[in-house]
């Protein structure tokens, strides 16, 4: 179940194993979400604050500094992809990264209903407003008028990209968690593609999900600006297995036993 590697060689290459990483602890909010319930949004539906707040593990099973370091080394890329099935600790790793990075982070937890372009753009505006207060007022106004005045998707997206281009400079990571739930939406794919092409230079996207996103990124890949972590990278290395059992489970294993765990 290994994916094709698009990134530079990883340090401390993980052992080959088909056994997934030990399930990680569920991330918790690092600060109270902006909303405890749904907040009315000008586009006509409610924004759920817990879907767009940064998160980090309250209690990780095991810190993974080699992967956090890998992230830090690749934040100058335009697109970072995390691709693995459930249970490999993708969200926990993103939480650990978000607490270590100096970059500002927008974290959007996706559901299938977010495949609607109005919903998707509305949440992006709300998330980016946590980074840039007052962001996207003109985009919001157009979203509000989609039904009343028939604002087209292209007009709204053009305004959104214009708002992005005029935003305050700085390093910003936009995390789209569980991206596989909306990857089938042509509208979402188009919006993400335009963001990759037109967003400010300091902004990069992190797509985390099951499988490789359906995006045309050949030009960016040719420029070395697409990086990927797959199942092989997310598996525990032998030293990580040894530390996990010794420090978390209180059951130290010898090297042979660690190898058995890795090969299960």
Language-model region placement:
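Alpha-helical sensor/transducer elements of the RecA-like P-loop NTPase core
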Residues: 3-4, 11-46, 50-54, 66-67, ...
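Short loop/turn elements that form and flank the Walker-type P-loop nucleotide-binding site
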Residues: 75-76, 168-170, 199-202
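Hydrophobic anchor at the beta1->P-loop junction of P-loop NTPases
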Residues: 82
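Walker B catalytic acidic pair
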Residues: 177-178
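N-terminal pre-P-loop "Q-motif" helix
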Residues: 58-71
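Walker A (P-loop) ATP-phosphate-binding motif of ABC ATPase nucleotide-binding domains
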Residues: 79
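Conserved phosphate-binding/catalytic loops and adjacent sensor/switch elements of nucleotide-binding enzymes
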Residues: 86-88, 92-172, 181-183, 228, ...
């Amino acid at each position: 179940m290994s994916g094709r590697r698009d990134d530079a060689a990883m340090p401390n290459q993980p052992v080959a194993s088909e056994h997934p990483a030990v399930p990680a602890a569920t991330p918790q909010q690092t600060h109270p979400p902006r909303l405890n319930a749904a907040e009315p949004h000008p586009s006509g539906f409610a924004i759920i604050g817990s879907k767009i707040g940064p998160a980090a593990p309250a209690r990780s099973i095991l810190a993974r500094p080699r992967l956090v370091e890998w992230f830090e080394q690749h934040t100058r890329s335009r697109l970072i992809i995390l691709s693995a099935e459930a249970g490999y600790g993708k969200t926990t790793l993103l939480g650990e990264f978000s607490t270590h990075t100096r970059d500002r982070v927008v974290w959007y937890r996706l559901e299938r209903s977010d495949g609607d372009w109005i919903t998707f753009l509305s949440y992006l505006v709300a998330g980016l407003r946590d980074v840039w207060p007052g962001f996207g007022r003109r985009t919001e106004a157009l979203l509000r008028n989609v039904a009343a005045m028939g604002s087209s998707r292209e007009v709204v997206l053009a305004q959104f990209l214009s708002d992005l281009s005029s935003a305050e400079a700085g390093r910003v990571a936009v995390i789209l968690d569980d991206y596989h739930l909306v990857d089938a939406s042509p509208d979402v794919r188009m919006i993400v593609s335009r963001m990759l092409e037109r967003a400010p230079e300091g902004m990069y996207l992190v797509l985390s999900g099951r499988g490789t996103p359906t995006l045309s990124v050949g030009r960016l890949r040719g420029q070395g600006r697409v990086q990927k972590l797959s199942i092989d990278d997310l598996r525990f290395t032998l030293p990580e297995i040894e530390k996990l059992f010794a420090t978390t489970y209180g059951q130290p294993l010898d090297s042979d036993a660690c190898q058995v765990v890795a090969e299960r």
